[in-house]
Amino acid sequence: MAIKAVLFDLDDTLLWDERSVKEAFQATCSEAAKHYDIDPAQLEDAVRREARALYESFETFPFTKKIGINPFEGLWARFVEGEQEEFRKLQSLAPSYQRDSWTRGLKALGIEDAELGLKLAEMFPAERRNRPIVYEETFEVLEQLKGKYKLLLLTNGSPDLQKEKLAGVPQLAPYFDHIIISGEFGEGKPAVSIFEHAMQLLGISAEEGVMIGDKLTTDILGSNSIGMRNMWINRHGLSLSDEITPAHEITSLRDIQKIIDSLEA
């Protein structure tokens, strides 16, 4: 059956979020190294560890897991949008979570300095916001696909944060006929419901769409669950799990068109 629509994940599929976060950590941890004799990489590891532990201790954790908001997004998110009451709790928790993650990270390296912890907690969001990084082939491929297929962006995350990421690269959103953010919908990938919602917006059956994403546990598992073909973009040579098998594996977005052509042959 002919492909009528292409569904894209956002983070680490079209936007290189992992690199943006890494560079923000490097800049912030290097600032800390100006104050104390520490290894910035060790501080980054400590803050990531403390942030994850804190994040998973909150009563909001099951909700953030369902929506698909990770601990490091929490280090720069404001959580000012979203109708669910959990977003108001996250909005309230965010300042102390961000401060405590950095303060505890410093403490793990033997540094008791709440003032510096607060400074770093305020610096990290600014550093992350200054780094909207797009993969080099993103616009080339979207330009190639636009007009041939309906395009839908299907992204997990907090509404305000995902919109902010898109605002940082303003030429990206206009390529899409529809944009679905899990925090607005109320459930994230791999839930069947969010894929059904996408198909309804596009007016397609599962066989008429193809999902492109970098995460086996969300993009690929979810599209597999509804019988939609998919392409797992594996830029870093990751190993496949035994439980989740993509229909196709690609290393660049430039591979998309030739695979669609083969599906329609």
Describe these PLM feature segments.
Residues 3-10, 14-134:
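N-terminal helical cap/lid subdomain that shapes the substrate entry/recognition surface
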Residues 1-6, 16-19, 34-41, 139-143, ...:
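Asp-based, Mg2+/Mn2+-dependent phosphohydrolase catalytic module
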Residues 74-77, 145, 152:
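Long, compositionally biased
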